[in-house]
Amino acid sequence: MTQKPQTYCGDLAHLRAALQPLTAERRWVVWPWELRKTKGGKEKWTKPPKQARDPAHNARSNDPSTWGTYDDAVATVQRGNADGIGYMLLGSGIGAVDLDHVVDEGKPVRWAEQLCAEATGTYQETTVSGAGLRIIGTASGP
């Protein structure tokens, strides 16, 4: 069996100032690392969304009744009942782009670094794997 990925979450109790306004919204979920088999029979680690107050139940991206508060999500992770937290984007006016496998030895590859530099007015972070980047900003559309 493959070893569970290392999770990089930072200090969840003190969210960065750029994301602080999002904590007032009831759009938060948690996720555990789960090892699943792909259609080809290989094993792959996934991060399925779970309800912040009850991580035994799935959260759905199109069902706000399955989302919770930031405080509930952080408490669930701190109790060890999930590995990380997530924010549901649907209808929020927030958009995110994940750049996978673009961090090498702690530094973004050149094209990813350039893209991030051009994405003014956004918040950027390293993904939980430590190997990717996420760009978060305001968005319109579905």
Model-identified regions with their sequence ranges:
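Conserved phosphate/metal-binding and DNA-contacting active-site motifs used
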Residues: 1-142
